[in-house]
């Protein structure tokens, strides 16, 4: 009897790893969004509108901006949104010759923008015909909730939708501003 009980226990120990469900990955993965828009203006004109890190007046979601150190590396800015939410950012790379700069968010409430560990680059490129510009805005980030089973407003889809909305809204407003001459 003891021998058969031992055999059953040994079989259970051997079979357990084979019957256990596979371990699942946990936590969020880094997401990326890239949006581009063609603007009927030369790159220099477009860069003149967006090349100053301290000036986000072209973006309709920004009602106020304040910052320090212009467009120097480690310059900071605080963007205030219509709902009084704020986003604090720091400039990490700036290349006027390549018409590009990169920045990252240092502080934001996930209720304002449902992301964490956000970094972004905005670049102005010549259009195919030489008379237009392509503006590319790309970012990488994690969702606003770092653990498994995030609430809907802080999941991957919410983060991607929010960043996509920021980029599309900004790029469309930039195009309208430049092409209308305002």
Located regions from the model:
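A short, structured loop/turn motif at beta-sheet edges
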Residues: 40-44, 92-100, 123-134, 176-182
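Bacterial N-terminal signal peptides that target proteins for export
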Residues: 1-9
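Hydrophobic ligand-binding cavity/cleft-lining segments
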Residues: 21-70
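A mature extracytoplasmic/lumenal domain signature
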Residues: 50-52, 83, 93-95, 105-109, ...
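Short beta-edge strand/loop motif at the mouth of beta-sheet-based domains
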Residues: 53-89, 96-98
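Beta-strand/loop substructures that line and gate deep hydrophobic ligand-binding cavities in soluble
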Residues: 108-165
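Hydrophobic pocket/interface hotspot
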Residues: 46-50, 56, 77, 91, ...
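C-terminal segment of classical bacterial N-terminal signal peptides
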Residues: 14-22
